[in-house]
Amino acid sequence: MGKRDNRVAYMNPIAMARSRGPIQSSGPTIQDYLNRPRPTWEEVKEQLEKKKKGSKALAEFEEKMNENWKKELEKHREKLLSGSESSSKKRQRKKKEKKKSGRYSSSSSSSSDSSSSSSDSEDEDKKQGKRRKKKKNRSHKSSESSMSETESDSKDSLKKKKKSKDGTEKEKDIKGLSKKRKMYSEDKPLSSESLSESEYIEEVRAKKKKSSEEREKATEKTKKKKKHKKHSKKKKKKAASSSPDSP
């Protein structure tokens, strides 16, 4: 059995397009655009002049609008001026009426005003005094509260420090005791186990005191020995210096 032939004939697309001939395009071509009718230079000048002049109808419409706008502005100004004049006249009338009424009631109002002003000033002084007292009391209370808070904080801090020191000392003593128990467990296992912790701590402190006293005694002995040696050396030097002078 032979293989099937799957080959396809190659067709050149350019050659196929040429064989079909020119395409019938719908619409204007590039040549139509290039060959379009164009105005002469004189016609262009006329169009530009017309644009500069503008249309007569638009100019007439603008003139009418301007006239109407001017009339409206004048009316509005007249209204404002008349309103301002009337308001100024009303104010002047009110001032005159107040002056007339003030002349008649000046004598009666002066006495009442003086009494009311004095009473108002006294009330204000009392209110200010009360406010000052309240402010002083508040400041005094706040200072006392702050002082008490600081004292309580300092006491708490001292207590905490003491507790921490006691705890550290106890821990150190317990650690030292545990080490010494391990060291001396072979020699005296029963005595260390039978005693309570407090008694054992006292014994350890007594032993520490004894060891410190023994160390002090040993240092004193060594100092005495050194002094004795220096004294003997001085005696020998004196004897050696005096021996050649004697014959």
Curated annotation (Swiss-Prot):
List, as start-end ranges, the regions of compositional bias called Basic residues. Answer: 89-102, 128-140, 222-239
Print the keywords alphabetically.
Answer: Phosphoprotein
* Residue positions, PTM Phosphoserine: S82, S191, S192, S194, S196
Provide the GO MF annotations for this entry. RNA binding
Q: Where is the composition biased (Basic and acidic residues)?
A: 70-80, 165-176, 211-221
Similarity-based family: Belongs to the FAM133 family.
Q: What is this protein called?
A: Protein FAM133B
